[in-house]
Regions:
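Membrane-embedded transmembrane-helix bundle of lipid-linked glycan/lipid transferases
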Residues: 1-218
C-alpha cells in the first residue's frame, strides 16, 4: 500500500535532494563548507546550472550550448527591460535603457565568460516591479486583480532560486515602489487574502531546495 502522507512525501523529497545536491569529492574539497546550513551540498539552488546541463544534453556537447544559453538569457534581460519601460514610459526611454544595458559588463561578461548566474536573475526585477505596479494601480482604482500580485510572488520565488542577491534587491525595489505609489495614489493598498495566497506561492517555491535557500540565513 502506497503511503502518501505528507511526512512520507517530505522524507522522499529530502532523500532526493540529498542525492541531487551532494557535491562530488573534487568540488567538495574546495567548496564543501560554503553552504553553512548544509555543508557538503550545493550552496546555491541548482536552477541556473541545471538549465545549462539541459542545454548540454540537448546540444550534445559541453561548450556551444552553454554559450548559446547564456546568449538567450542575456538577451532576455534586454527584452524585459525594454518591454517594461516601454509600457510605463514609452519607446524612447525603453530603447535608451536597453541600449545602456548592452554596454554594461554585468550583462555582456556572463555572455563572454559563462559566469555570474546572479546577473540573469536581475532580468526578473523589472517584471516583478511591473506586475506589482499593475496590482497596486488596479487595486487603488477599485478593480481588484490579485493575479498581478500572485505573478509577483511567483517571480520572486523564481528569483531567489536563481540568486538571493537579486531577490533582496527586488524586495528593496518593491518597498520603494510601494511608498512612491502610496504617496502618488494617496491610498493604502492591503488585502490579507491576496497577501496570504502570494506568501503561500512563494513558500512553495522557496521550499523546493531548502538546503540552499536556508543557507541564505545561515
Amino acid at each position: 500500500m502506497i503511503n502518501l502522507s505528507i511526512k512520507s512525501l517530505w522524507n522522499r523529497w529530502i532523500k532526493l535532494l540529498k542525492s541531487f545536491n551532494k557535491l562530488p569529492a573534487y568540488i567538495d574539497l574546495r567548496y564543501g563548507n560554503d553552504n553553512k546550513y548544509k555543508p557538503h551540498t550545493l550552496w546555491y539552488p541548482p536552477t541556473f546550472h541545471s538549465s545549462l546541463g539541459v542545454a548540454e544534453a540537448i546540444g550534445g556537447e559541453r561548450i556551444v550550448p552553454v554559450f548559446l544559453m547564456n546568449t538567450i538569457l542575456s538577451t532576455f534581460i534586454l527584452i524585459t527591460v525594454y518591454f517594461v519601460i516601454n509600457s510605463l514610459f514609452g519607446f524612447l526611454p525603453a530603447i535608451l535603457s536597453s541600449l545602456l544595458i548592452i554596454f554594461s559588463p554585468r550583462d555582456f561578461m556572463p555572455f563572454l565568460w559563462g559566469q555570474w548566474p546572479e546577473r540573469f536573475a536581475y532580468a526578473f526585477v523589472p517584471l516583478i516591479l511591473y506586475f506589482f505596479y499593475k496590482y497596486f494601480i488596479t487595486y487603488s482604482k477599485g478593480a481588484k486583480k490579485p493575479a498581478y500580485l500572485y505573478i509577483t510572488a511567483l517571480l520572486l520565488g523564481i528569483n531567489i532560486l536563481i540568486h538571493p542577491l537579486a531577490f533582496f534587491h527586488s524586495l528593496a525595489g518593491l518597498a520603494v515602489l510601494y511608498v512612491l505609489l502610496l504617496i502618488k495614489q494617496k491610498k493604502f493598498v492591503f488585502n490579507l487574502k491576496h497577501i496570504g495566497v502570494s506568501i503561500t506561492i512563494f513558500i512553495i517555491l522557496f521550499m523546493l531546495f531548502p538546503f540552499q535557500t536556508f543557507n541564505i540565513f545561515a
